[in-house]
């Protein structure tokens, strides 16, 4: 059973920010849920950037990614299989890998834009 502790919440990390759809706490895990509309939710492809986004939100909200961390993308079909939904879960190991990749993207974006908010 989960308890929702945040809806449409702005999260600010070290050099990045965004708005997540749901922050939840469960008995065995806690995490972030982000909804995505897509042409067909039943297609298996999930962009790596979606995992990185959830990892970034996790770090911004919780300060890190421990073994109880989890995240979900909920895909909602808008054209094919209209109204169908699919949930994709990311465990702590996947989120840690995604966070490592995201840190590189954050650094590259800051370099490209000469923007270092915490310098």
Q: Which residues does each PLM region occupy?
A:
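Mg2+/Mn2+-dependent nuclease catalytic core
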Residues: 5-112
């Amino acid at each position: 059973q989960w308890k929702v502790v945040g809806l449409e919440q702005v999260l600010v990390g070290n050099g990045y920010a965004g708005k997540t759809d749901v922050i939840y706490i469960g008995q065995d895990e806690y995490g972030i849920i982000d909804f995505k509309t897509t042409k067909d939710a039943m297609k298996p492809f999930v962009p790596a950037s979606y995992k990185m986004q959830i990892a970034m939100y996790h770090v911004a909200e919780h300060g890190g990614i421990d073994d109880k961390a989890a995240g979900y993308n909920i895909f909602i079909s808008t054209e094919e299989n209209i109204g169908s939904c699919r949930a994709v879960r990311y465990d702590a190991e996947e989120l840690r890998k995604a966070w490592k990749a995201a840190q590189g993207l954050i650094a590259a974006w800051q370099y490209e834009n000469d923007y270092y908010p915490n310098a």
